[in-house]
Amino acid sequence: MRAVALFPDEPELRVIEKPKPTPENGEALIRTVAVGIDGSDRRIAAGEIGGDVPDGEDHLVIGHEAVGVVEEPNGTDLARGDVVAPLVRRPVGDGSRFAANGELDMAPPGSFHECGITGAHGYMSEFFTARPGYLVPIPESRAAYGFFVEPASLVEKALDQTEAARSGFDWRPSSAFVLGNGNLGLLALTRLETGDEFERTYCLGRRDRPDPTIDVIENVGGTYVDSRELSLDEFPAVHEPVDFAFETTGHPAHAVEAVDALAPNGVVTLQGIPGSSSTVEIDGGAFHTDLVVTNKAILGVVNARRSHFRAAAEWLAETPESVLDALVTGVYGPDEIDEAFADSAETIKTVVSFDR
């Protein structure tokens, strides 16, 4: 079978031939339909993050945003033809309470592998195997968009963790602010705008018009905020202090500055990972005081569990195809991997399709 693999010693992506995997007892064989490409994949391909190969191998099959169809149920409770999206993390060894509880998204580093990212092969191949517990069903009508489930699950986790942090009182949020207009930021904005949690949404970027990302923001009903014209501490006076902020930029200063944009009792979740070390100058006393006296919170959020994937699949089923189509700027075959990984101002989400 064909697979797209990273050889980290170069680093280089290659299309290679690998044996079709044989499912072990309790695993199903999945035929890959499509795999989304995000910023993490590009950083992995460039050798900036992840890229650890499985034991005894010299390459890593990349790709973690996948949708596939059950080819061989192999005695599991799945049926041939079921459309599924795979989770990303797998436990290292046995005895993980996080794995036993279905909470690998909260497991400490070193206790898991991440398929297509580090330590375990991913899904950018014609077939892969997985246990049913690491697969989430998707409506057949959304099979062409199932690669959105994994990134959308991050938004669902952020909302879940935020609601848990505010479950001790009658919190009534009405506004949300997405920091970053890359593919995750635009997907997050789309989820927040089409959901029923918030009445108003905003999205931060650094683009001049005309621009396809600004078009997406405004077409779904959000308000574009240019960070070159308006700082985060100025944002509340011009627009409003927001109840929820979802950071995707990986810009270290945003971990601090986003708090300025929050309303009392507001929450910011951090999803972006900085590419390098950076020094941020702040008034520590004012920052500390603001968090305390206005009950604000900062949460780090990474990965997602099965319940978040299910919530993402439910959202996907209800979202118009036209909205999802606006987020996809290129679909390529596995032999067009250079084109699929190319990035430009016009790029939002690119996809590798194994049905081409």
UniProtKB/Swiss-Prot annotation:
NADP(+) binds at N181, G182, N183, L184, R206, R207, V301, V302, N303. It comes from the Archaea. The keyword Membrane does not apply. Disulfide bonds: none annotated. One of its GO terms (molecular function) is glucose 1-dehydrogenase (NADP+) activity. Its cofactor is Zn(2+). Zn(2+) binds at D38, H64, E65, E150. Keywords: Carbohydrate metabolism, Metal-binding, NAD, NADP, Nucleotide-binding, Oxidoreductase, Plasmid, Zinc. InterPro entries: ADH-like_N, Glc_1-DH_arc, Glu_dehyd_C, GroES-like_sf, NAD(P)-bd_dom_sf. Its EC number is 1.1.1.47. It is an enzyme of class 1 (oxidoreductase). It catalyses: D-glucose + NAD(+) = D-glucono-1,5-lactone + NADH + H(+); D-glucose + NADP(+) = D-glucono-1,5-lactone + NADPH + H(+). It holds the Pfam family Glu_dehyd_C. GO terms for biological process: non-phosphorylated glucose catabolic process. Substrate binds at S40, E114, E150, N303. Catalyzes the NAD(P)(+)-dependent oxidation of D-glucose to D-gluconate via gluconolactone. Can utilize both NAD(+) and NADP(+) as electron acceptor. Is involved in the degradation of glucose through a modified Entner-Doudoroff pathway. Belongs to the zinc-containing alcohol dehydrogenase family. Glucose 1-dehydrogenase subfamily. This is Glucose 1-dehydrogenase 2. It comes from Haloterrigena turkmenica (strain ATCC 51198 / DSM 5511 / JCM 9101 / NCIMB 13204 / VKM B-1734 / 4k) (Halococcus turkmenicus).
